[in-house]
Amino acid sequence: MNIFKILFILNYALIFLIKIYQNTLSKIFGLQCIYKPTCSKYSIECLKKYNFLTALILMTLRIIRCNALFKGGNDFTPKYKPILESLKEFKKRLIK
């Protein structure tokens, strides 16, 4: 099996796990995310739009930003240069 098939399978396996989270734990703990779309929806969008490694970096940066040290609001998946845009968003939203 080549690496592209493995990464494709990983993308959809992670989407499956996120959907399980959305339908179970997310409902138990309530909506805690400070962003629109929520971090789990953002993660699914990243996994559908980008390769596994890029999506993983974007998801990690977003989850790190989802706390009281950062300004919330609308934060959609970046269209161009996704990792660079996400890092800029990280710096821009940090509460000083």
UniProtKB/Swiss-Prot annotation:
Topology in membrane: Peripheral membrane protein
GO cellular component assignments: plasma membrane
Top-level taxonomic group: Bacteria
UniProt-listed Pfam families: YidD
UniProt main location, coarse: membrane
Location(s), subcellular: Cell inner membrane
Alphabetical keyword list: Cell inner membrane, Cell membrane, Membrane
Record InterPro entries: Membr_insert_effic_factor_YidD (IPR002696)
NCBIfam families linked to this entry: membrane protein insertion efficiency factor YidD
Family: Belongs to the UPF0161 family.
General function of this protein: Could be involved in insertion of integral membrane proteins into the membrane.
Name of this chain's protein: Putative membrane protein insertion efficiency factor
